[in-house]
């Protein structure tokens, strides 16, 4: 208790060590204020003048109570009440304390309809661009501007933030397998989407994919096999659909089912994949899938990778194989 009293005494007199002095033609130095021809000490931010100065006594300053503040040097008779809590579409960006008013701004997904002296007073939800349209910018107030997605781009969701994404006209599905025993090096042209050996069958099924698969490829080197399925480049993916690939590797022996997990890659284009291995002929499988816009090489690619097993060193596809019609 004595410690608290000592602190309050210090607060009261820290601004009042010197008695007031006479003003110079109504002017005072620093932050001092003039009263009845005397220059008196002002209170620091976070305090108010609980008693103004007089002959022989300087200003008495007291701290602001909770919910009130003073932001600058002053000799005000009371602290200012803080703004009320931020509600609705408003979120607090500056809490109320002894030296600051509460500041409210729009929460994510909203924009300011009415600005106040300190923050925003009224917020409203931003416009959401429908599927087939993307965000092109914002109004001066911060509302969303939408534009129809140009050719070879897409937006498939109702969103106040999503811009039109790029599409693709080429898909390559490459895989590496271990161990394999049968020696092979073949290229197959035609709408087959199946690679078959004595040990396993690799089948590619797909739905809602516009680029057309027309080439299959498989080769071996030692105990490792590599192959793939490839499309042409003359058709772009319809951006209102999601290209879905299902790659199944069916061993000639066993019936265990393993679903490969994605280990690398993101998605900025409309596609999804499922990769499964059925049977017990393989210990390691790696599947790489690339979606590309060949008219913008290196700029517009989605690359995803799926892996199962522990062996990570795989050999690349041979540059040449004997075509098989």
From Swiss-Prot:
Glycosylation: residue positions:
105, 181, 205, 238
What does the entry give for GO biological process?
Answer: positive regulation of membrane protein ectodomain proteolysis; regulation of T cell proliferation; symbiont-mediated perturbation of host defense response
Q: List the disulfide bonds.
A: 28-39, 40-53, 43-61, 64-79, 82-96, 86-104, 106-120, 123-146, 129-149, 164-185
User: Which InterPro entries did the record assign?
Assistant: Poxvirus_TNF-rcpt-II_C, Poxvirus_TNF_rcpt-II, TNF_chemokine_rcpt-like, TNFR/NGFR_Cys_rich_reg, TNFRSF_N_viral
Q: What molecular functions are annotated in GO for this chain? A: tumor necrosis factor binding; tumor necrosis factor receptor activity
The signal peptide, as residue positions, is 1-16
Tell me the ranges holding the TNFR-Cys repeats. Answer: 27-62, 63-104, 105-147, 148-186
**PROSITE patterns xrefs:** TNFR_NGFR_1, TNFR_NGFR_2
Coiled-coil blocks? none
Q: Which CDD domains match?
A: TNFRSF_viral
Q: Which UniProt keywords apply?
A: Disulfide bond, Glycoprotein, Receptor, Repeat, Signal
Q: Relate the protein's function as given in its record.
A: Binds to TNF-alpha and beta. Probably prevents TNF to reach cellular target and thereby deampening the potential antiviral effects of the cytokine.
What's the protein called, per UniProt?
A: Tumor necrosis factor soluble receptor
Question: What organism does this protein naturally occur in?
Answer: Rabbit fibroma virus (strain Kasza) (RFV)
